[in-house]
Amino acid sequence: MPTTSSIRNISDTALWVAIYRARESERTDAIFNDQFARKLAGERGEQIANEISSQKQPDWPFVARTYSFDKIINDCIREGADTIINLAAGLDARPYRMELPETLRWVEVDLPEMIDYKEEILRNEAPRCRLERVKLDLRERTERQQLFARIGGDSKRTLVLTEGLIVYLTREQVIELAQDLYVQESIKDWATDLSSPGLLKMLQKNLSQLENANAPLVFGPEEGPNFFTPLGWKATGVFNMLKVANQLNRLSLFFRLFAMLPDSQGKKPKAVWGGVIRLTRIES
């Protein structure tokens, strides 16, 4: 990937976010250890992160998000998940860095360019589980439905991850994705991050370069986690990223004061709230 200083497209956000994982991993009191993150991010990822950091984008939301997803993954594996599908997997290295069962099937789905880049960087590394990669534009609904059916048919209990994905989708696209996942009976859980309309508005202002790169932040439902209930998914775990970051001792004094406020659980549209939610299939 060539080196320039600004975000060009949505795939560049993976380089940017990997730097935050690298920075956390290099701390003496690191919450997690992603030893592959800096290599995956490369020089370009560092440039993008430095540019955005100058606009006061703190590290802690990404640390809290990563930690929360890790927790949901571990919980679901303990409960019997045998397959994980990571949609728009980007530069996530969990199959390499997490303690996972060797029998676990992990499927990463992303655009061909992203997968080719990632495979080249990690070519000499061995995953800790059964890792597969699928080159697919997730906007192709028929193809993704076929993929879900193929994977779901071979699984007893599947967890789907959409980390840093649905905020870029329209409301209609999120509805369609929720429907496509629900069709597969073996898909029991879905982990995703979610923004309130209040947070979405703030991020749109602070990260305007995303819109300039044709990667605008779009989705922040007024219903909060309840948005998914009519679509067959119930929020069984809600992790407020501010409060998680506070528990992990990653907040400045300024943010610690806000962390003391009551948690809206994403149900107050005007509140600046960001979280990670575990959605569990509502059996009909």
Language-model features, listed with the residues they occupy:
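Short, glycine-/aromatic-enriched active-site segment of Class I SAM-dependent methyltransferases
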Residues: 197-215
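Conserved beta-strand signature within the Rossmann-like core of class I S-adenosyl-L-methionine
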Residues: 159, 184-197
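Conserved catalytic loop of SAM-dependent methyltransferase domains
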Residues: 236-260
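A short, conserved alpha-helix within the catalytic core of class I
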Residues: 143-144, 168-184
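Rossmann-like AdoMet
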Residues: 1-85, 89-136, 141-148, 154
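A short SAM/SAH-binding and catalytic strip from SAM-dependent methyltransferases
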Residues: 157-172
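Short alpha-helix
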Residues: 215-240
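C-terminal lobe and adjacent flexible extensions of AdoMet/dcAdoMet transferase-like proteins
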Residues: 271-284
